[in-house]
Amino acid sequence: MVHIFRIFYLKEVDELSQEITTYLADKFNTVRNQTLTLIEPLEQEDFVIQASTDVSPPKWHIAHTTWFFERMILQEYDDTYHVFDPVYNYLFNSYYNSIGPYQPRHQRGVLSRPTVKDVIAYREHVDQAVLTLLRQERETALQQVIEQLVEMGLQHEQQHQELILMDVKYNFFTNPLLPAYQTRQVERRGTAQSPPLTFTRFEGGLVEIGHEGAGFAFDNESPVHKAWLEPFELATRPVTNREFMAFIEAGGYEQAEHWLSDGFQVVTQQQWKAPLYWMKDQQGDWSIFTLNGVEPLQLDEPVCHVSFYEADAYSRWCGKRLPTEAEWEYVGRQVDQQGNFMEQGSYHPVPVQDANQSVNGMFGDVWEWTASAYAPYPKSRPLEGALGEYNAKFMCNQMVLRGGACVTPGNHIRATYRNFFPPAKRWQFSGFRLAGDL
């Protein structure tokens, strides 16, 4: 059954043409090849490691993104397509209950088979079929649906490119050898010191939030709606390691008065003393584990790999708060959306380079926690069919992050993009900036 999904597309319906098909075919090859580039540094043994229930093995990621194209597009819209292996529908379905049962998330790391070679063959099989399907002539409305779904599949794959880097980093950190994902020297942009932390004032008022118009957006970014903002101030850059270090040295992790109750319980149970990946040696010197290996902690880089609880506690400690997602988006629409993204190749945040905008560093480097719970926008409706499970069913017990990170593809992010994680998670590249009331 054909459904017209509510996905904002690149052009109006009457402009869909061979140009769009060519564009999508080129983008398909580019995105799929980028995933293969990301796994090139890995050894065979790295592909099946799952160091915690939060992460997935790299092999599972490259198979799951392929399954998405096979199950959501080829099996639905190509009568001539032959499924590569029917068992893969169980192995590589992530969480789509409407499609059927699936391998439990915490057991993805037990799948020594299919082999990496098998999964690469699976990708090649599906890639050829998708490109063939795209180039076939058909009724315009059906072609539009297929093109929209291919675009969504590519956006989904870009999310998993970031997840591959997140998960590999965590897997390697649990290894006593602390191996580096990449050993090449990467020139990092940025200055030796971050600019001083100041605040920019905004009058607020009645503003519009959400996505509409041309360009892709997920269903959780719409519809556009009104939001009232009281006057507020927003920090001109994210909080740095130097500033967060002051919180640590002041005993912030031991002082319950700064923490939400659930947050302090997590801190106590898991014995947090610093952000994830920070390491202190016997001489009291700090280092940090990165995808480039262990490096000295650079104090002027944005603090990264902190949970919502840590970001919130720090904000309370210094008499500020986190911005709401509406405040963040309102400002984010007004600034340059360039930043330190995956394409730069360092896979690590760097100090804010430019201080020539009212607010800097909102895009790239680190995802920024907001004070907003992940919830549907007014009058929002999930997509039809299985894709209705993509976002809507996770709108509980999660907090919103904005802006993208150093492992996010640059053409994947926008001011309206809503990322989300449970408040205790911190293996994602998450930081924060301060806000305040006026």
Can you say where each PLM-predicted feature lies in the sequence?
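Functional-site microenvironments in short loops/helix caps that host divalent-cation chemistry
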Residues: 153, 157-159, 163, 167-190, ...
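Short, glycine- and charge-enriched coil/turn segments that flank and shape catalytic ligand pockets
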Residues: 79-81, 136-145, 185-194, 357
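Disulfide-stabilized, aromatic/cysteine-rich ligand-recognition loop
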Residues: 5-56, 60-129, 133-136, 143, ...
